[in-house]
Amino acid sequence: LYRYKIGDVLRVANFYNKAPQFHIVGRKNVCLSIDVDKTEETELQKAIAASELAHLRPHNARVLDYSCYTDVKTIPGHYVIYCELSPINHSENSSFSRVIDQCCLTIEQSLNSVYRTLNAYYKTIGPLEIKLVKDGAFHEVMDHATARSASAAHFILEILEARVVSTHFSPGVPSW
């Protein structure tokens, strides 16, 4: 249970003997913001699920884990999602690269109207970016955290960035 933190919203998925087994549903009161937008964890989770269903499942791929942050070092700032997919041979497939680009756009289309307006009309939010990480990257983050008895938040970006295998941006702007 070392993966669960205070503020995680859990759902009992199964029982092993009489002990409950949990799945993380989301995190309470976690949000991303660049301008006046506010994207909560549950909204982002639904957007990623919609993108997975529309684009990844037809290729027998699925999202195993993800983490996101707002990159405000670029102008305009934008959302970055580190994503680990189920093990498939996608690294050299250019058509799969276009699939991930479409995932970016579908996620943006699924976010709230404030985000879409700031992205499409005002241009104060840049295109969403997905960075695919190598298989097992999120397990490495958790192993690193437990070995140091520290929160993964302190070093997650550094570890994930070192394990990026490809980078993808939204090919268009969401409708608003």
Features from the language model and the residues they span:
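AMP-binding adenylation
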Residues: 1-176
